[in-house]
A protein has these predicted regions:
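Basic, glycine/lysine-rich polyanion-binding surfaces/domains
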Residues: 1-101
Length: 102
């Protein structure tokens, strides 16, 4: 799960409280914070054009909405989905060490 970094101070305690209740009920679950992992969203009418420059060998125009693929972005292996929450076309790029995308 990726949470919005701007809400981390509220979301993490909320998840931890529900996790504790879940475990008390006899179910098995755990939570691990991975601060170096992250997600970058590229949204808007030029999203595919902007991202295409960073993914040689991949034809983003062939990637359908809500499709997902592992691909090399700017030299790093990433998990990319064609999705968005803005109402515009977009991509969400997940990486183990998000700083490598900058």
């Amino acid at each position: 799960m990726v949470i919005n970094a701007g809400h981390e101070d509220k979301d993490l305690p909320h998840l931890a409280a529900h996790l504790a209740d879940f475990v008390k009920s006899g179910k098995d679950a755990s939570m691990e914070t991975l601060p170096h992992n992250g997600l970058v969203a590229v949204q808007g009418p030029k999203a595919a054009e902007v991202l295409q420059r960073m993914v040689p060998g991949v034809v983003l125009s062939e990637m359908k909405f809500m499709a997902a693929a592992t691909m090399t972005v700017n030299g790093a292996e990433c998990f990319v989905t064609r999705s968005g929450y803005t109402g515009e076309d977009g991509f969400e790029i997940g990486a183990l060490y998000i700083c490598i995308l900058y």
